[in-house]
A protein has these predicted regions:
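C-terminal, non-catalytic extensions of nucleic-acid polymerases
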Residues: 235-325
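Polymerase palm active-site segment centered on the conserved acidic dipeptide of motif C
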Residues: 160-226
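Ordered core of a single globular domain
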Residues: 116, 120, 168-173, 258
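A generic structural motif
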Residues: 15-25, 71-84, 136-137, 179-194
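Conserved polymerase palm-domain catalytic core
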Residues: 37-150, 155-165, 201
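Short catalytic/ligand-binding loop motif for oxyanion handling, primarily in non-cytosolic enzymes
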Residues: 50-52, 213, 288
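Extended, charge-rich low-complexity interaction segments
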Residues: 214-250
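Core catalytic machinery and nucleic-acid-binding channels of phosphodiester-processing enzymes
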Residues: 3, 7-64
Length: 325
């Protein structure tokens, strides 16, 4: 768990972005980091990531983890066994026993951490294959490429001279030789996807990078609208909350994500939800979330703003008595 905590704590300097809060100023920092490397790049994904993940990489990552801990051979062996049981395991299905030799189960606490690092390993392995002989050393990869990963999602800012031979298509072709299917973030096969795009146009974690309407140097993280609206259509049965309580929570979450799209979409979605609830006599379930309130919450994530936000910030920026957008 210490290794997982280290990975999350140092995400500003590492590729894995586990622990990031997209609905904060962290999203701005992430885009600024990528743009500091290059204005061009690409975002990728994988088809059946777990099913194509080489167990050798998982084992190699365990060695990296052990080297990081450096706490003796006994603890190292314990970790090897525990992680080995995760990616090379037996499971019972009805009256049969199945042997699974690759991929990590979704319930395993380190799955997203390890998958994020495997994602990074794929980049380095592709570099070793694709780079000209004078640039094979991985230090050159770090000089020319800055990457972000989260599970099987990835984004790469690549210097334009390097993009000629290190891009989404060339990486996809390399990975295909090893039985791994690479796609862009929209699930288009590598062979038909654009080799590179404007780095600001990529999506990551199904979220875009959109300049704030009033402060274009800051970036919002709008989630695709389909994901925002679909959660309003159903709830998952729970022993701890009623269907109405679950729906109310879904409405709250959808409105929080709608804020990222700006005031127009926020108001449109709010009106649709209010009308739908009124039709079935459940108007009381509507969230009290306002666009102004969400804007203030977002501003409070910007370093240096918190103290000011608690005093004159709302009055100076939004005016007095603004309750709804």
């Amino acid at each position: 768990m210490d290794f997982a905590a280290m990975t999350m704590k140092n995400r500003k300097d590492l590729s894995p972005q586990c622990g990031i809060n997209p609905c904060s100023s962290e999203w701005t920092w992430l885009m600024m980091r990528l743009k500091s490397m290059s204005a061009k790049g690409f975002a990728g994904d994988f088809k059946n990531f777990d099913g194509q993940e080489p167990s050798e990489l998982q084992d190699a990552l365990c060695t990296v983890v052990n080297n990081w801990y450096n706490d003796g051979p006994v603890n190292a062996q314990i970790r090897k066994v525990l992680i080995g049981e995760a990616f090379d395991r037996y499971t019972i299905v009805h009256n049969g026993v199945i042997h699974i030799q690759q991929g990590l189960p979704s319930g395993f606490v380190l799955t997203v951490i390890f998958n994020s690092w495997v994602n990074e390993c794929y980049k380095y392995l592709a570099w070793l294959d694709l780079a000209p002989s004078s640039r094979k050393a991985l230090v050159h990869c770090d000089e020319d490429v800055d990457s972000i990963t989260y599970g099987d999602d990835n984004g790469h800012a690549v210097k334009e001279d390097t993009l000629v031979w290190f891009n989404l298509r060339t990486i996809g072709m390399f990975l295909s030789k090893h039985g791994i299917t690479y796609t862009d973030e929209h699930k288009n096969h590598w062979s038909i996807a654009k080799p590179s795009v404007d780095i600001q146009s990529i999506s990551f974690l199904k979220r875009l990078f959109v300049p704030h309407p009033d402060m274009p140097t800051f970036f919002k993280a709008p989630l695709e609208k389909k994901s925002i609206e679909e959660r309003l259509l159903w709830v998952t049965e729970s022993k701890f909350a009623s269907p109405d309580e679950l729906l109310q929570e879904n409405i709250k979450n959808s409105m929080q994500d709608a804020y990222q799209w700006g005031p127009v979409y926020f108001s449109e979605l709010r009106d649709k939800i209010e009308d739908a609830l009124a039709e079935v006599g459940k108007a009381h379930l509507m969230s009290e979330i306002s666009y102004t309130g969400e804007e203030m919450k977002w501003f409070e994530t910007v370093p240096g703003v918190v103290d000011y936000a608690q005093s004159k910030f709302a009055q100076d920026v939004f005016g007095v008595g603004v309750a709804r957008a």
